[in-house]
C-alpha cells in the first residue's frame, strides 16, 4: 500500500514544476489553460489567477474527460495546462491525473501565494 507522500513523490516526478515567473509570462497565451484546483472557499478568501478555470481537485477527472456531461470545453489535450493550488501538492496530484488521462503538456506552477507575490494578474 502506498502512502500519501509516496503518491505525491511520484506526482512530483511525473509533473514538471514551472517556476512562477515563467508561469506569469505564459498568462494570456491562447495556447495556455490555467486551472485552480483549490476549493471554492479558499478561492473566495484569497482570489485566484485572472482567467483561471476553477475546478476543484475532486472534480478534475470529470471536467477533463470529453466523454462526460461535465467536460469543461476549455480542457483540450492540445493546450498547455498550468495547475495551481495552495502550495503545489494538489497541483502535482492533479497534473499526474491529467497526464494519465492523455494531457501531455501539464505543469505544476505551485501555490497561488507565490503567483500573487510575483505580481501575476489576479481576480476575486
Q: Could you say what each language-model-derived stretch is?
A:
Residues 35:
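Active-site flanking residues adjacent to catalytic metal/cofactor-binding acidic residues
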Residues 84:
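Short, surface-exposed ligand- or partner-binding patches at beta-edge/loop junctions that are enriched
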Residues 1-32, 40-80, 89-124:
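Rhodanese-like catalytic fold shared by cysteine-dependent sulfurtransferases
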Amino acid at each position: 500500500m502506498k502512502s500519501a507522500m509516496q503518491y505525491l513523490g511520484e506526482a512530483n516526478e511525473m509533473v514538471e514544476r514551472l517556476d512562477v515567473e515563467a508561469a506569469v509570462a505564459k498568462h494570456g497565451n491562447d495556447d495556455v489553460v490555467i486551472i485552480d484546483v483549490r476549493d471554492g472557499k479558499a478561492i473566495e478568501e484569497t482570489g485566484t489567477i485572472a482567467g483561471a478555470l476553477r475546478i476543484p481537485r475532486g472534480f478534475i477527472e470529470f471536467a477533463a474527460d470529453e466523454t462526460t456531461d461535465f467536460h469543461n470545453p476549455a480542457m483540450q489535450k492540445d493546450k498547455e495546462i498550468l495547475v495551481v493550488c495552495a502550495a503545489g501538492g494538489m497541483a502535482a496530484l492533479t497534473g499526474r491525473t491529467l497526464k494519465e488521462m492523455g494531457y501531455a503538456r501539464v505543469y505544476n506552477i505551485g501555490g497561488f501565494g507565490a503567483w500573487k507575490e510575483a505580481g501575476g494578474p489576479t481576480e476575486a
